């Protein structure tokens, strides 16, 4: 699991330093985070539990994404460009693994913040964990969506939006989508006999993996040499450096604090 956690960090560095194609960079990140979530999740909830998580996550996220492409709900009107590889219906295949990989990390950070040391959901944690984890995951989208849509056109918002060409509805839709699949999993997981990994590093591994999300917008700002303006689908022009600076700032004050909260709240090995 250390390997997969480290791979998540290195994939960001490699893709930015080598300017890899978006599909390749996305596949590297999605693959490393999904493998990490699979094995770390199995050590906590067993194989049946983590497979249930994956099935619900992929099913709900793909359904909501396709629904929004066709109807505008819940994210808004958009469509994917041609850079993201093969698709499941109207959604690129690598989107699902990203939902799972980042979703599982968000879930695990929420557990640490809420003091869930043993993985046994009970009482308020059944509902509090999905609520907090969904906020954590939406913070990640706040740092990537303007770049991935407005700058690189991996997906295109038909009517643009106030957040550098991204509509506010997108982030509300993200919260709804993530909350639904995490809440379904929480209701299922409370019946499981959780068996969290008791070896040293159980909490350090997801914190390392999530650090790739913490550093990504800052690296994007510092390593990119892109200048000038880009236009969204409505023709509104946005300065590339403004997008990179603001998303780095948003990440610094949203993604990083959640990571630090989890770091400070993580149960000590003797309690685990």
Residue ranges and their predicted role:
Residues 1-272:
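Aromatic-rich, lipid-facing transmembrane alpha helices and their immediate juxtamembrane interface loops
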């Amino acid at each position: 699991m250390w390997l997969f956690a480290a791979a998540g960090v290195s994939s960001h560095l490699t893709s930015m330093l080598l300017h890899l194609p978006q599909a390749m960079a996305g596949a590297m990140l999605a693959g490393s985070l999904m493998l990490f979530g699979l094995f770390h999740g199995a050590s906590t909830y067993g194989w049946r539990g983590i497979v249930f998580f994956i099935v619900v996550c992929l099913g709900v996220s793909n359904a909501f994404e396709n629904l929004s492409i066709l109807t505008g709900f819940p994210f808004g009107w958009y469509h994917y460009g041609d850079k993201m590889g093969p698709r499941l219906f109207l959604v690129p295949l690598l989107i699902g693994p990203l939902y799972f990989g980042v979703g599982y990390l968000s879930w695990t950070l929420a557990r640490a913040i809420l003091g869930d040391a043993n993985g046994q959901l009970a009482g308020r944690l059944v509902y509090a964990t999905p609520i907090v984890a969904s906020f954590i995951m939406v913070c990640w989208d706040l740092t990537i969506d303007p770049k991935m849509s407005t700058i690189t056109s991996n997906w295109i918002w038909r009517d643009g939006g106030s957040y550098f060409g991204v509509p506010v509805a997108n982030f509300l839709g993200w919260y709804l989508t993530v909350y639904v699949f995490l809440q379904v999993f929480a209701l299922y997981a409370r019946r499981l006999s959780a068996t969290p990994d008791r070896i040293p590093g159980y909490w350090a591994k997801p914190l390392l993996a999530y650090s790739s999300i913490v550093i990504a917008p800052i690296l994007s700002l510092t390593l990119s040499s892109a200048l000038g303006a880009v236009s969204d689908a409505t023709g509104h022009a946005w300065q590339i450096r403004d997008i990179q600076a603001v998303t780095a700032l948003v990440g610094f004050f949203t993604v990083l604090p959640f990571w630090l909260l989890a770091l400070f709240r993580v149960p000590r090995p003797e309690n685990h």
